[in-house]
Amino acid sequence: MPITEDTGLDRLLDAETIAVVGCSTTPGKAAHDVPAYLQRQGYRVLPVNPFADEILGEVASDTLVDVAESVDLVNVFRPSEEVPEVLDAVRKRHADRGDAGAAWLQLGITHDEAATEAEADGIEIVQDRCLKVEHSRLRG
């Protein structure tokens, strides 16, 4: 089951490095402003966007597999129909590297089947919640 209780959400906020799949270069978009907020809170934000070279002062990777650094949490800003592909990449990374043990799907983003498959492989999942809102609520 995806994490919904405050204790589990707060535990995921102990992450240090967050890969943001679908990170945007455009201020004013949630996919830019949420990662910028997280960066201001002290998280290392690693943007994943094949159409950008740099976002928020960090080199942007084309795919999650291309992120060289260890990843604690994957924050997803992609449409729900793309979630299976994104979570497959999280599962592969977790199996190959032992990191990326959790994925946080932003507000409005869900895919129960893909989430269940990822959980079966040991990935913790949050769906349909804003990481910025939950961080502010639990740690602000």
Task: Annotate each language-model stretch with its function.
Residues 24-28, 36-56:
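NAD(P)-binding Rossmann-fold cofactor-contacting core
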Residues 64-109:
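Mid-chain, well-packed structural core segment of small domains
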